[in-house]
């Protein structure tokens, strides 16, 4: 109890001293701001006089002003003339000035009358302000040394002393109160109030706001500051009470982690509530309170800027994916440890920051010549591509469409298959040759589907049948159908260019669900085989159209059909999924926010119908899996270049683990025979692995030198090596299965990027010596896939494949050189001539010294085998050992000359004590037993004499 009272008195004394020092700081600050307010009032008084002088000059001419001033002087008689400001000529001549413009003296001498309003003699007042600032700085320095740092850190309050430079610059700035922005920025709960920043100029109505004084503003700041410190003081006392109540004898500085987390949450909640009460006292309505509370919550959750996320070297492209940034920082870290001669000799180059393995594009690209409109002369009608009256052409189109809806569309469900086939069979064949907007739009969507399917078809290796578990729907194109494609080698690009021209033209002045679907098809095509900027721009078109049509409100015009509601709902969620996942894979922040709560509830209802009643025939099961992943990404993707804190990391792992348990069936990741039969079905699982690896690879930055701009809190991370390695094993087993099925070059874009990420992780772990056995096996599987890809001959060889291999081999080369140099340095300095293991051998056992030649020394294995037969023949003789009396430490000496063995001592024990006869018989039997002392039981009695305290 005395310890608790002492701790309580210490805390009370500390809080009282803190309160006294805080009051001193408040008084000094109030004095300073009162002085500043007087200076501001005088500045505004001079400004008003200047405006009055200009008005007088504009209203009357010089003669009128002269007459007026003369009359005024006559009325005043000999009274002393006092003015606030003299003109330059009067000051130079050192004569009285009447303060008019022009003044009387300048009018008499016909000189130009000029006033200098900037030159104001305020030396005395400036000295007062400077002294006040010095007092504040001195008090701040004394307070900062003695102020409890834990209270300031827990309350997120930073007290900055105003400097002379701030005070002097404030008077010359357009806004004299601009230095108050700095004070408000130091208080986290002030960042959300726009009306905290006041101005001395005019208000919204154009009137001068002379009623806003700095001391009023400072009073509000100090009110909230005191409430914030009060909450921290209460929290500190409560925490101390809980700790002492739980364990009186425990160290008061050691707090249970669970209790500290609960106290931290309580502190956050109480701070938010008290801040809301302080703001309510300032006449802020409930809506503003909600906004400010949310901003306070975001501020309390310490988010620090990431020291790793960065731009590309020569482009305004910000990267948030850690696997794209990690090679750059690794290269910089290793090159610092190598000599310039070694770098030049080995031709080492630092890997650049880029999106490694963006897609599997290659072979042929879109050739952008100025504008697609320039090619309109060569593309006038769709009849140049296919003849829909020809049965061979029609059969080829049907096979391509069937492949798209079976192998590509189920992942994102951009197109409603049932509606498309209905329009294709009923409307398109009848209106295909008509020149109207509806027919052109549907034709464009058809051509986008065909161009995407042709690109996927080229990813299959001709004449090679896969041996893996994944299968893919074969087109089974006949020779006549294949000859049509051979005669038109650039048909894919021409189909896309025609569709892009029509859609871009219609988007110029129209909005519709079909245009949203068209832009999503263009986004998918660009994600497959073109650049990131083109993909982002196409995705932005779809997002802007969703926002422009307000699909997120889940509201409809008065005249609409039931199917319009379905189209609006599905188009929005499809755009939402692609926006979140493609933006995440691109390393950019998403553009489309979550919709109204009604749409989320409806989404859950549709999901239940999808899995239970099969009522939704638009979205597939894979689409709902991608939807759940996109919602997870929305919660944890940071816009302002921030890393996840500890709590967010744990929440992310929990939600991803729930997704894995829900949708991925089976404990073995390579048993896809029952779950994954087609290649498209594994895309949600690969997206899950991509999200996992992207966030978990951040822990590898701990193995390299931290950045100079790194904050201590930004380096805090829950490292889980086993989790990262297990997901690397899942990814590499899945990629190996894809490679065995000869489907690696089918342009699903995560194939190459995931292989690069897993291989990069293994290289870093092997260099650091972490989980060497597991990473060796994963590394071996990666090398087998790389060799297979290098030996393969696809029609469109990925252009980013050499980039990924070069980066991995360059980093591996750097690692090998640094390890070799380190090994040579260690061998040269410390040496490796360690000799045999004699110094490493144990010299003492539990209760004796190793190597004693006594009865307890065990014979080695060879002697046991040689004497085994002898012990069996003479068991009685073999049981005899050297008597314990021969040991000096077991011998009891009397009179310094007679040595009595333990046997005789036990035998004579009963005769001296007068024990009964039956007891004496038992004692004699024990004394005559040859096994009692041979087992060396009494030698262990020395163990009880040891001090284990």
UniProtKB/Swiss-Prot annotation:
Q: Does the keyword Glycoprotein apply?
A: no
Output compositional bias ranges, type Basic and acidic residues: 862-874
Q: Which InterPro entries match?
A: Transcr_Regulatory_Elem, Transcription_factor_dom_fun, Zn2-C6_fun-type_DNA-bd_sf, Zn2Cys6_DnaBD
Cite a single Pfam family from the UniProt record.
Fungal_trans
GO BP term, pick one: DNA-templated transcription
Any keyword Nucleus?
A: yes
- A Gene Ontology term for the protein's cellular component: nucleus
Source superkingdom: Eukaryota
Q: Which CDD domains match?
A: fungal_TF_MHR, GAL4
Q: Give an example GO molecular function.
A: DNA-binding transcription factor activity, RNA polymerase II-specific
**DNA-binding region(s): which residue ranges?**
87-113
Q: Which SMART domains match?
A: Fungal_trans (SM00906), GAL4 (SM00066)
Instruction: Write out the ranges of the annotated region (Disordered).
Output: 164-214, 862-888
Q: Cross-referenced PROSITE patterns, in alphabetical order?
A: ZN2_CY6_FUNGAL_1, ZN2_CY6_FUNGAL_2
Residues annotated as transmembrane: none
Classify the main location: nucleus
Low complexity: compositionally biased ranges: 164-178, 200-212
What's in the keyword line of the UniProt record?
Answer: DNA-binding, Metal-binding, Nucleus, Transcription, Transcription regulation, Zinc
Tell me where in or outside the cell this protein is found.
Nucleus
As a miscellaneous remark, the entry gives: Present with 98 molecules/cell in log phase SD medium.
Q: What does this protein do?
A: Binds to SIN3.
State the name under which the record lists this protein. Answer: Probable transcriptional regulatory protein STB4
UniProt source species: Saccharomyces cerevisiae (strain ATCC 204508 / S288c) (Baker's yeast)
Q: What is the lineage of its organism?
A: Eukaryota, Fungi, Dikarya, Ascomycota, Saccharomycotina
Its gene? Answer: STB4
């Amino acid at each position: 109890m005395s310890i608790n009272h002492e701790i309580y008195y210490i805390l009370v004394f500390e809080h009282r001293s803190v309160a006294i020092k805080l009051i001193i700081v408040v008084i000094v600050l109030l004095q300073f701001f009162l002085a500043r307010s007087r200076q501001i009032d005088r500045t505004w008084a001079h400004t008003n006089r200047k405006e009055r002088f200009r008005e007088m000059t504009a209203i009357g001419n010089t003669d009128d002003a002269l007459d007026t001033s003369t009359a005024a002087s006559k009325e005043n008689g000999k009274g002393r003339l006092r003015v606030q400001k003299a003109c330059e000529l009067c000051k130079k001549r050192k004569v009285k000035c009447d303060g008019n413009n022009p003044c009387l003296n300048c009018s008499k001498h016909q000189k130009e009358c000029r006033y200098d309003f900037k030159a104001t003699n305020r030396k005395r007042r400036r000295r007062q302000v400077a002294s006040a600032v010095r007092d504040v700085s001195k008090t701040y320095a004394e307070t900062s040394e003695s102020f409890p740092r834990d209270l300031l850190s827990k309350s997120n309050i930073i007290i900055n002393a105003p400097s002379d430079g701030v005070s002097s610059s404030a008077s010359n700035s357009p806004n004299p109160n601009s230095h108050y922005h700095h004070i408000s920025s130091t208080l986290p709960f002030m960042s959300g109030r726009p009306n905290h920043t006041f101005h001395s100029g005019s208000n919204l109505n154009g009137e001068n706001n002379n009623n806003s004084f700095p001391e009023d503003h400072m009073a509000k700041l100090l009110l909230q500051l005191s409430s914030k410190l009060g909450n921290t003081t209460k929290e500190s006392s409560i925490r101390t009470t809980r700790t002492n109540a739980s364990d009186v004898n425990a160290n008061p500085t050691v707090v249970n982690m669970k209790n500290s987390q609960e106290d931290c949450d309580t502190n956050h909640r109480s701070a938010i509530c008290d801040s809301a009460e302080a703001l309510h006292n300032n006449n802020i309505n409930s809506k503003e309170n909600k906004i400010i509370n949310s901003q306070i919550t975001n501020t309390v959750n310490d988010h620090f800027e990431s020291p790793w996320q960065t731009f590309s070297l020569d482009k305004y492209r910000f990267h948030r994916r850690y696997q794209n940034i990690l090679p750059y920082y690794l290269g910089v870290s290793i090159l610092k440890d190598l000599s310039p001669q070694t770098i030049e000799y080995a031709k080492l180059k630092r890997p650049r920051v880029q999106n490694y393995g963006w897609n599997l594009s290659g072979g042929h690209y879109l050739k952008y010549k100025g504008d697609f409109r320039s090619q309109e002369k060569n593309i006038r009608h769709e009849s140049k591509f296919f003849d829909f009256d020809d049965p061979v052409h029609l059969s080829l189109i049907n096979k391509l469409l069937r492949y798209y809806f079976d192998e590509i569309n189920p992942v994102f469900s951009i197109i409603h298959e049932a509606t498309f086939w209905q329009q294709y069979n009923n409307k398109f064949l009848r209106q295909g040759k008509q020149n109207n907007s509806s027919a052109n739009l549907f034709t464009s969507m058809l051509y986008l589907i065909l161009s995407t399917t042709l690109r996927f078809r080229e990813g299959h290796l001709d004449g090679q049948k896969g041996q893996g578990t994944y299968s893919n729907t074969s087109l089974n194109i006949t020779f006549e159908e294949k000859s049509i494609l051979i005669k038109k080698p650039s048909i894919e690009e021409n189909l896309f260019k025609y569709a892009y021209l029509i859609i871009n033209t219609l988007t110029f002045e129209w909005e519709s669900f079909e245009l949203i679907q068209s832009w999503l098809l263009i986004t998918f095509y660009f994600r497959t085989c073109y650049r990131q900027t083109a993909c982002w721009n196409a995705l932005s078109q779809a997002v802007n159209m969703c926002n422009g049509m307000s699909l997120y409100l889940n509201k409809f015009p008065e005249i609409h059909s039931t199917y319009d509601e379905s189209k609006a709902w599905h188009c929005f969620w499809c755009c939402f999924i692609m926006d979140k996942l493609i933006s995440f894979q691109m390393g950019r922040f998403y553009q489309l926010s979550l919709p109204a709560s009604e749409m989320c509830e409806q989404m859950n209802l549709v999901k239940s119908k999808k899995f239970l009643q099969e009522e939704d025939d638009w979205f597939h099961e894979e689409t709902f899996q991608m939807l759940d992943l996109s919602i997870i990404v929305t919660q944890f993707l940071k816009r302002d270049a921030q890393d996840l804190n500890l709590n967010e990391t744990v929440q992310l792992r929990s939600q991803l683990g729930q997704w894995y348990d829900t949708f991925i069936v089976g404990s073995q990741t390579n048993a896809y025979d029952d779950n994954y039969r087609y290649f498209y079905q594994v895309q949600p699982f690969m997206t899950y692995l991509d999200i996992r690896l992207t966030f978990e690879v951040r822990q590898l930055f701990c193995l390299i030198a931290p950045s100079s701009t790194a904050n201590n809190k930004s380096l805090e991370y829950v490292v889980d090596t086993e989790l990262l390695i297990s997901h690397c094993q899942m990814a590499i087993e899945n990629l190996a299965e894809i490679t065995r099925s000869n489907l690696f070059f089918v342009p699903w874009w995560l194939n190459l990027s995931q292989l690069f990420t897993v291989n990069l992780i293994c290289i870093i772990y092997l260099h650091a010596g972490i989980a060497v056995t597991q990473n060796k096996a994963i590394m071996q599987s990666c090398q087998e896939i790389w060799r297979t890809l290098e030996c393969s001959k696809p029609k469109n060889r990925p252009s980013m494949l050499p980039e990924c291999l070069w980066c991995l081999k360059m980093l591996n080369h750097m690692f090998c050189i640094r390890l070799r140099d380190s090994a040579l340095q260690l061998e040269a300095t410390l040496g490796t001539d360690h000799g045999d293991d004699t110094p490493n051998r144990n010299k003492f056992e539990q209760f004796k010294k190793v190597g004693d030649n006594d009865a307890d020394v065990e014979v080695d294995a060879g002697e046991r085998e040689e004497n085994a037969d002898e012990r069996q023949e003479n068991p009685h003789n073999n049981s005899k050992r050297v008597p314990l009396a021969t040991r000096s430490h077991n011998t009891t000496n009397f009179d310094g000359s007679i040595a009595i063995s333990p046997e005789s001592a036990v035998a004579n024990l009963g005769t001296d004590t007068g024990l009964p006869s039956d007891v004496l018989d038992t004692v004699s039997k024990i004394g005559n037993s040859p096994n009692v002392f041979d087992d060396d039981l009494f030698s262990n009695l020395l163990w009880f004499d040891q001090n284990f305290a």
